Amino acid sequence: MVRVRFAPSPTGPLHIGGARSALFNYLFARKNNGVFIVRIEDTDLERSSRESEKNILESLKWLGITWDEGIEVGGENGPYRQTERLDLYQKYAQKLIEEGFAYYCFCTEEELEEERKNLLAKGEMPRYLGKCRNLTPEQKEKYLAEGRKPTVRFKVPAGRTIVINDLVRGVVSFETDGIGDFIIVKSDGIPTYNFAVVIDDVTMGITHVLRGEEHLSNTPRQILIYEALGFKIPEFAHISLILGKDRTKMSKRHGATSVENYREKGYLPEALVNFLALLGWSPGTEEEIFTMEQLIERFSLDRVAKNPAIFDLDKLNWINGYYIRNSELSRIVELSLPFFQSCGYVSQNPTEEEMRKLTKVVEATREYVVTLSELPEHAAIFYQKELAFEEEAKTLLADEEARNILRKVADKLREIPGSEEEEIKGFLKKLPKELGVGGKKVYMPLRAALTGKTHGPELYQVIAILGPAEAERRIMNLFN
């Protein structure tokens, strides 16, 4: 059975790259009727926090990425936080030492820095040269007496080529001579990433490791640990980096970098999932809109690209706009409510009347926005008593003929029997004939008078939302 995992470090919010890794693992597990595990790699004690952990888990849930085993949901392979598994790492580190695959290293940071500088001066790759590999018991005692706290290093075999058959990148090989003996347990007893990740993956039965390309260089070290402990090596798939449009590493200047930022800006979870799936994966067709169910059905690693994925904010905006326009109206109203509340257009405990109006407002304006946060700006014409007039609208309303027509329209507005859209549509349709002028001469100044703009929602929607009385008031304001 396929078993995959997402293992974030809780040192900050869930970033776009992490969200994509989680999504690809989730899709792969669901496609193959497998198990998706979420565990927390919190061995960076200084930077890890429960607050960040909470943010990451909430962001995953918001995206609709659920897990079968792991943090919060439990399972038979727990605990699922690395800081709660230290005894396990210690046990396997001791096994490696006893079997001659690892050793205690007493080198100080100063000594290691000196060694690094010397290698660089010779034009060689910095690596540990094995000074403590073959210490005598007396030398170890001497270092301990000096108060030195040892690390544990893995003994890297010389002259080997490690070959990885990566499911995305194909055959990749590494020479062990360029690696050097690496630390697996720090002097404070905390395991390093490369060691802990192997122990976790093995004890949790992980069959496939899908992760970012930046982890590729760690893979030979991890394979050496698998081999030394006699563990089965999982399949690896390293997903390409996400770059900005300028082909540099994704950063804040390319747009928001965390899932939380996009949520706050009014992006829909299904739009972000759709967009993230297309960052490095291709369906093999021209289609661009996919539900989670469709992604699960279509996803495969052989359609994941080796080349870097380009983060195109315009494309995300297009996808998000599509979902805003085409999702159930009631859902968009519910999701947009906080944005209307934060600017004071809707109260914190909305009345039925407020919600009825909001529903009409969202229906009238949603086709003009790409994020929910833009809705209040487009809806301001329905909530603000004083309109801000665009220059084009001012010019239109300065025309004497237009002003005369508007006076007549104001009188006619009193004749509308109610404020239902169909009634208003009928009223608007017969208005030009009743006034004896072309439709354009009625509708353009009327729109300008009611909204301060020359473009926007359908006129019948504008009057239905404002109500005939408010529409009349706005027209008469022009003459006061």
Curated annotation (Swiss-Prot):
Known EC number: 6.1.1.17
Family: Belongs to the class-I aminoacyl-tRNA synthetase family. Glutamate--tRNA ligase type 1 subfamily.
One term of GO molecular function: tRNA binding
PROSITE patterns assigned: AA_TRNA_LIGASE_I (PS00178)
Sequence motif: 'HIGH' region, positions: 8-18
SUBUNIT field: Monomer.
Gene3D superfamilies: 1.10.10.350, Glutamate-tRNA synthetase, class I, anticodon-binding domain 1, HUPs
Protein's name according to its UniProt entry: Glutamate--tRNA ligase
S-S bridge residues: none
UniProt-listed GO biological process terms: glutamyl-tRNA aminoacylation
